[in-house]
């Protein structure tokens, strides 16, 4: 059980690395928290520091999700765990996302979790990620509003998990991740309702 606790904590800390803030500060000298929406995610980084820095942030946020899950998959293949592998990896995924969304390094105010969620599920439920990506790119044909596409990805992934009959632990994990993503987009949802979102 000790290995589970340690890897969950390390995964949370990995997710907590405020990549958008650090990269933007290093490459442009801008504190992304003081510009645009104030969010450290790649969408706001693009707004305040340009496409190149935003793309670097996006890649790093995705890797932040992939790497802990990959390492924990390797651990699960070598060590007998007190819980199922699906349960273990699902807990790791939620830890990474929570770390990103509520990073202790920035007063528990992190990003909105889209890229890190996609990265975390990339190895755990690749078909669900693919379904989310398809929905995202289809919606690009109809809207430029990033929050609509992001929320749609979050909703699509648990639906895909259910449709694909993935293990219940992974499906529940996807539902929780979707809930966190929607929660982090609550201000965007309010603006959408008021027709103020851009």
Curated annotation (Swiss-Prot):
Pathway: Lipid metabolism; phospholipid metabolism
Enzyme class: transferase
Membrane topology: Multi-pass membrane protein
Keyword Phosphoprotein annotated: no
Protein name from the UniProt record: Glycerol-3-phosphate acyltransferase
A family per Pfam: G3P_acyltransf
GO cellular component terms listed in the entry, alphabetical order: plasma membrane
EC number(s) stated in the UniProt entry for this protein: 2.3.1.275
Gene Ontology MF terms: acyl-phosphate glycerol-3-phosphate acyltransferase activity
Keyword Kinase: no
Keywords in alphabetical order: Cell membrane, Lipid biosynthesis, Lipid metabolism, Membrane, Phospholipid biosynthesis, Phospholipid metabolism, Transferase, Transmembrane, Transmembrane helix
Residues annotated as transmembrane: 2-22, 55-75, 88-108, 118-138, 162-182
Catalytic activity: an acyl phosphate + sn-glycerol 3-phosphate = a 1-acyl-sn-glycero-3-phosphate + phosphate
């Amino acid at each position: 059980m000790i290995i589970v606790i340690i890897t969950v904590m390390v995964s949370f800390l990995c997710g907590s690395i405020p990549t958008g803030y650090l990269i933007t500060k290093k490459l442009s000298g801008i504190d992304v928290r003081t510009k645009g929406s104030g969010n450290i995610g790649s969408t706001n980084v693009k707004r305040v520091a340009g496409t190149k820095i935003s793309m670097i942030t996006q890649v790093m946020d995705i890797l932040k999700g992939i790497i802990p899950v990959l390492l924990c998959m390797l651990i699960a293949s070598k060590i007998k765990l007190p819980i199922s592998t699906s349960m273990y990896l699902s807990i790791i995924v939620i830890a990474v996302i929570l770390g990103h969304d509520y990073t202790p390094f920035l007063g528990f105010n992190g990003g909105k979790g889209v890229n890190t969620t996609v990265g975390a599920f990339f190895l755990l439920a690749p078909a669900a990620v693919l379904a989310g990506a398809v929905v995202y790119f289809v919606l690009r044909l109809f809207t430029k509003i990033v929050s609509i596409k992001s929320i749609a990805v979050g909703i699509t992934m648990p639906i895909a998990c259910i449709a694909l009959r993935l293990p219940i632990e992974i499906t529940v994990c996807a539902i929780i991740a979707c809930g966190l993503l929607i929660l982090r987009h609550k201000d965007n949802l309010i603006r959408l309702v008021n027709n103020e979102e851009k």
